[in-house]
Amino acid sequence: MKYNKFLAVSMSAVLSLTLVGCSTTSSAKELKGEELNKIQKDDKEKENYLVIDVRDEAAYKEGHLKHAINIPTSEIDKSIEQIRTWRDKKVVVYSDDANKTKEAVEKLTKQGFKDVTSAQSTKEYSYEFVKYTTLNSSKFQDALLDTNSNKVFLDAREKKDFDEKHAAGAKNVDSKNLDNLQSILPEDKETPIYLYCYSGNRSSVVSQKLIDLGYKNVYNALDGTKECNYKFEIADCCTEPGTK
């Protein structure tokens, strides 16, 4: 009798664990490619999501979603600090392999991210891709502080905000009037060009124009000055005499 009771309890425990495991798998959130494309096209809605392309860097550079940053699955654990502010917000992960995406979702969840969704893979859905690199605020700030490399900054904000403060050596551009953009660009199309605006939308327009003009190393700030208090230099044109 005792043996039968023990067997019944054991079977019940195994069944419970199995059901829990099945429940976890089936409750994993998934996003259709069509929906993710719509989010990327909506300048306001995209602000509510952090989209991470977890393919390797080479695949990312061949083309990726407009507002997606690149963190390969193998590098997620050591890159958490860069995206820690998104722990309580919506995060969407995609790649060219469902297993990579699943692993990335699991890693982010273990690191405390509460709302992680997997999207259809690039093999399952034909996404609209761009070829410029999208940087999160952490990496863009690093670029601002790095004075050793030969890079160019373009500021796509209104002139009044540009005049107040901007990246060292930055040039102000109007995303709605790019006819004369070529005249302020370096001749060497391998030159790294970094762009920013208020929320990444205007600068993404200019970024695409640069790609169309043949520039190879274009970097757009996902987070603009409304979302991140970047450490900019005060514009020389607006500095009070005797204060420098």
Residue ranges of predicted features:
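Rhodanese-like catalytic fold shared by cysteine-dependent sulfurtransferases
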Residues: 2-8, 22-39, 45-49, 56-90, ...
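Gram-negative bacterial Sec-dependent N-terminal signal peptides
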Residues: 10-13
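Bacterial Sec-type N-terminal signal peptides, specifically the leucine/valine-rich hydrophobic h-region
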Residues: 16-19
